[in-house]
């Protein structure tokens, strides 16, 4: 019962992670955030691997999934520090998120709750084929939305890591017990064959 509840809980957390990652992937695509898109793709693959390992009793897959979650927590911690401009990090260095391929920023910058976008005409700051906008009236600025999204990912990852370690430990213990029982049964099964063969041989020759 405990094993089943652990597996079911891990699958539930993996499904929540998958939904949250897909939701984040959509908005990162809309904002052309190529670095987060790549990280989200790897995370989705790792979560699918974790679900498969849980359902198929594969402890190695769960270990790989848990190892990825450590990297995923570190990445999301970096995202939080980046958008909140902790230390030397600054949003002006947005080439980190776009691999310096565009000037796009987070989709939430213009589409956040309550945001009003106003084009700034004849601005000297505008580059070629680009325009400057003014965003006002946001109920929650986009850096905080991105930080909250990353905090949710960290929360799910921490719980997933704990349950992945627990379930993989249960699977490893079961594999060891099955190997021991299987070896003992195979050894005990050969002895009756030899004795029965010795008992039947005289009966065959006398007939």
Curated annotation (Swiss-Prot):
The gene is NKAIN1. It is found in: Cell membrane. GO terms for cellular component: plasma membrane. InterPro entries: Na/K-Atpase_Interacting (IPR008516). Residues 1-21 form the signal peptide. GO terms for biological process: regulation of sodium ion transport. It comes from the Eukaryota. Coiled coil: none annotated. It is a multi-pass membrane protein. Keywords: Cell membrane, Glycoprotein, Membrane, Signal, Transmembrane, Transmembrane helix. PANTHER family: SODIUM_POTASSIUM-TRANSPORTING ATPASE SUBUNIT BETA-1-INTERACTING PROTEIN 1, T-CELL LYMPHOMA BREAKPOINT-ASSOCIATED TARGET 1-RELATED. Interacts with ATP1B1 C-terminus. Belongs to the NKAIN family. Residues 22-34, 83-146 are extracellular. Glycans are attached at residue 100. The chain crosses the membrane at residues 35-55, 62-82, 147-167. GO terms for molecular function: ATPase binding. Residues 56-61, 168-207 are cytoplasmic. Its main location: membrane. This is Sodium/potassium-transporting ATPase subunit beta-1-interacting protein 1.
